[in-house]
């Protein structure tokens, strides 16, 4: 029977509690149970006067509001303040009464500019959330993946000027110069005067600078959009996809440049370096490979395809003999090491007399040259070791897991938490946005882990579910003890062929297996080769 709707019901009085209006399974209830936010008060109390002035708004309340904005992808603080006054669940999470108004959007802006501008509060909050993740066993610390993503700055790409910027020497330049001097000493050549390597006071390169946001960088890369951007270099742990480090640079800085700093930040946050790190092909660099080897980290780096488009033979047609340190041309003639350049490349030259009558001379080098030259970086051996490992079955498994960790983390941040665009001007505000976004994503990992444990403990009382859960956990334990996992069937460890004597020695450690990616069950992987193993021709 159709009933008429009573009018004026909005004007009736009811006795209700805010606690009753928020569903038990609401996301914010889970966040409240999983995360302890009380540390924010201790973190910020020194920024407030203890005995003078008007009573301030609790800093924990302000940052809880910011967390709501990042968690639900609310980019505008005006919109966020409006949502707090209209959304009952938001009021409950902030500890407000039903009729109490939340802080104004200008209050958040004023505190950011006047109180939280120069003390890295956002980074400290991220560190504390990460500490809670580590404390609850969500971070393995063995296998990490690092990558970068571009974030559109609040700057018009047409409003720019050009300035001359002095080139900053790379962190590894001193070590590279020492290796170059050793090379030249072996060849009986005079060492370079490396003081000439320092950029002159008036030197440098022309660089586009935005007149709106001078701290961002113009991005000019193949396959990337043109304009002014920032780059976030993010490192995630493979166990539960927890973000363990965030580093922000202008987009005109090469991805390779901040890697030494990133490794130091990871060591400071975790207390140790990982056993292996995965990178995409943008980090395919001999200096990075040497840095990883020096820190005893097994790298897994995407392989770059040969892109030689010239009319003469590319370097990939020449085979390198590790035992004799020579290159072999397609006609089976040797190219010998003759010198090392100031940039750190060893130059290998062929015999001009043999090249003179070679049937492939015109295909190998130009008519103005008398012999062929091939360059090899002084740290190329370290990069070759990584290339060899990445091509193995276990290396491919490690590399394939990269897109399910770091790529998924970036996709989540951009699609759900507003990281596609910078919210404010300046690299300091960009760092705050990246750190708080990463902190919110780690909070979601904490919530997921906590309520998975609660689910397993509650369903243990149901016989059928209890049996299934017990079988699932037993399978987890078997895999963590080192059982091998293939695409279809588990394989017993004793059935795996061990390395022959004299070959590359290896150790085994479990990594996440893509077959069980939904719950991060580990599978086996071949770790780094023994460092004492001699080089052999690939």
Where are these regions (language model features)?
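Hydrophobic alpha-helical membrane-insertion signals
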Residues: 1-29
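Anion-binding and metal-coordination hotspots
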Residues: 4, 73-86, 96-529, 535-538
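Generic alpha-helical segment signature
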Residues: 11, 24, 37, 58, ...
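A general alpha-helix detector
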Residues: 17, 61-67, 107, 128
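Short secondary-structure boundary/capping segments within folded domains
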Residues: 19-21, 54, 224
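Basic, short loop/linker segments at the boundary and entry of helix-turn-helix/winged-helix-like folds
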Residues: 24-67
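Glycine-rich, N-terminal phosphate-binding loop and its surrounding beta-alpha-beta segment
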Residues: 61, 67-71, 75-78
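Short amphipathic alpha-helical interface patches used for protein-protein assembly/oligomerization
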Residues: 90-94
């Amino acid at each position: 029977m159709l009933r008429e709707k009573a009018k004026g019901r909005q004007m009736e009085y009811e006795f209700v509690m805010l606690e009753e209006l928020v569903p038990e399974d609401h996301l914010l209830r889970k966040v409240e149970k999983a995360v302890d936010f009380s540390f924010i008060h201790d973190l910020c109390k020194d920024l407030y006067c203890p005995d003078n002035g008007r009573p301030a708004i609790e800093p924990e309340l302000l940052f809880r509001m910011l967390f709501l904005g990042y968690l639900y992808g609310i980019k505008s603080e005006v919109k966020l303040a409006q949502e707090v006054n209209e959304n009952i669940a938001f009021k409950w999470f902030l500890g407000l009464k039903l009729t109490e108004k939340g802080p104004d959007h200008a209050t958040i802006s004023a505190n950011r500019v006047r109180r939280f501008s120069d003390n890295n509060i956002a980074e400290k909050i991220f560190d504390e959330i990460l500490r809670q993740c580590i404390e609850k066993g969500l971070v393995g610390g063995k296998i990490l993946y690092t990558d970068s993503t571009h974030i559109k700055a609040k700057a018009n790409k047409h409003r720019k000027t050009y300035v001359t910027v002095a080139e900053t020497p790379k962190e590894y330049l001193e070590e590279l110069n020492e290796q170059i001097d050793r090379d030249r000493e072996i060849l009986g050549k005079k060492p370079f005067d490396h003081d000439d390597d320092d950029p002159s006071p008036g030197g440098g390169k022309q660089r586009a600078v935005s007149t709106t946001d001078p701290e961002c960088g113009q991005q000019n890369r193949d396959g990337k959009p043109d304009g002014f951007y920032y780059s976030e270099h993010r490192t995630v742990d493979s166990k539960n996809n927890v973000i363990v480090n965030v580093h922000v640079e202008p987009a005109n800085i090469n991805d390779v440049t901040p890697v030494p700093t990133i490794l130091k930040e990871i060591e400071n946050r975790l207390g140790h370096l990982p056993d292996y790190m995965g990178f995409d092909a943008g980090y395919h660099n001999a200096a990075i490979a040497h840095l990883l080897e020096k820190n005893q980290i097994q790298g897994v780096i995407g392989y770059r395809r040969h892109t030689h488009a010239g009319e003469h033979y590319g370097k990939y047609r020449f085979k390198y003999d590790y035992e004799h340190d020579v290159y072999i041309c397609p006609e089976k003639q040797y190219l010998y090491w003759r010198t090392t350049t100031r940039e750190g490349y060893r130059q290998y030259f062929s015999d001009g007399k043999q090249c003179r009558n070679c049937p492939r001379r015109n295909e190998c080098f130009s008519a103005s040259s008398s012999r062929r030259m091939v360059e090899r970086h002084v740290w190329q051996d370290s990069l070759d070791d990584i290339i060899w490992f990445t091509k193995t079955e276990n290396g491919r498994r490690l590399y394939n897991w990269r897109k399910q960790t770091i790529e998924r983390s970036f996709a989540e941040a951009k699609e759900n938490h507003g990281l596609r665009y910078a919210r404010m001007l300046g690299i300091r505000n960009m760092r705050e946005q990246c750190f708080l976004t990463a902190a919110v994503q780690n909070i979601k990992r904490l919530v997921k882990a906590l309520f998975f444990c609660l689910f397993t403990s509650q369903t243990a009382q149901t016989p059928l579910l209890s049996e299934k859960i017990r079988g699932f956990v037993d399978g987890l334990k078997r895999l963590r003890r080192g059982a091998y996992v293939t695409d279809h069937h588990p394989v017993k460890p004793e059935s795996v062929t061990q390395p022959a004597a004299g070959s590359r020695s290896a150790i085994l450690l479990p990594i996440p297996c893509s077959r069980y990616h939904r719950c991060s069950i580990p599978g086996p992987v071949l770790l780094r080769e023994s460092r004492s193993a001699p080089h052999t021709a690939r």
